[in-house]
Amino acid sequence: MNRLAFNRGYLCGAMDRVVDGGVEWREYIKSALVDLKILWLDPTNKPIDIGVEDLENREHRHRCKGAGDFDTLCTEMKLVRHVDLRMVDICDFLVVNIDLDVHACGTYEELGWGNRMKKPCLVRVIQGKRNAPDWLFGMLPHQLIFSTWDEVIAYLRHIARDDHIDHLKRWMFFNFTGE
């Protein structure tokens, strides 16, 4: 049994204010769970050719800011935001990375959007669950807030394969594989 086969998971977390553009943790999660056949929606590697957020585009946006070209910046970021929120729309669950030391404007909008749709939003807080913002505990079942990637991975494996799971009034599964 693999409840998560062909489910779409959105990898949500800061990109523009982190050194690696948010790539490393996303690649780690994808490789650690490759056997679950999850279809990952990754904003660092979008399955679409618009709203791309690579190093080149990030540097271009920073140049626009520096030059005061806010019209161009707004036009480009509205497209990025549109594509990213669309990925939240079509995903089945979110994996969210929160670092309390990094301002993550889009991350909180995407998390809020996914939560309003009652999607499972698995939040990993780098500083640990005990340091997670209090607001998160009012938004999400605390069982979806984690301190480490190992906990997130173990939880997803539990959801995918164990006979008895708590759906937390969020998980909904369609059997695409016939297993």
Residue ranges and their predicted role:
Residues 1-179:
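Conserved catalytic or regulatory cores that recognize and/or transform ribose-phosphate-containing ligands
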